[in-house]
């Protein structure tokens, strides 16, 4: 039985750069090319200089990815901080529905997600949530932070699974412990009747099975 993962659809920076170069023309393409190179090179000073030449901080590509999203994916906290102070839209969504907070959660960038949430980034948006994104990859520091900020522990994702169900299926023992400590509901079922305990059992995750049973879970 496999695990849940989002990585296959999220490694898009190289393709994004190419798409930007193809779709843009003239001076704008040249400036954007310089801007992307500066972001890739963690050159906050150069990014600052380019934006001062008139580039909109909320410029997006054809997929709706903003400069803030690129900086988040790159893990550049300094650049994220700079963009936020220059009114980058913290809850913008790209065509995949991702926000900067969602991307930070998926990548496990704990410092960055704290900056984004402090700037008004949504913790409990509709659809996929930052908590569930972090749970996919077992980013425990991010998970712990989101729980402390009021993340909905039992939110049901578009795949009809909760964070506890996903963590149990993927075998993330530490994550399961955090979710149970936060009193996640052990008995939520998906439309097929599956529970966190059922998925943990099918995946052969004996320690998680034991934890769930101790918490009163039913299969």
Q: Where are the model-predicted features located?
A:
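Ankyrin-repeat boundary/linker signal
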Residues: 60, 93, 123-127, 156, ...
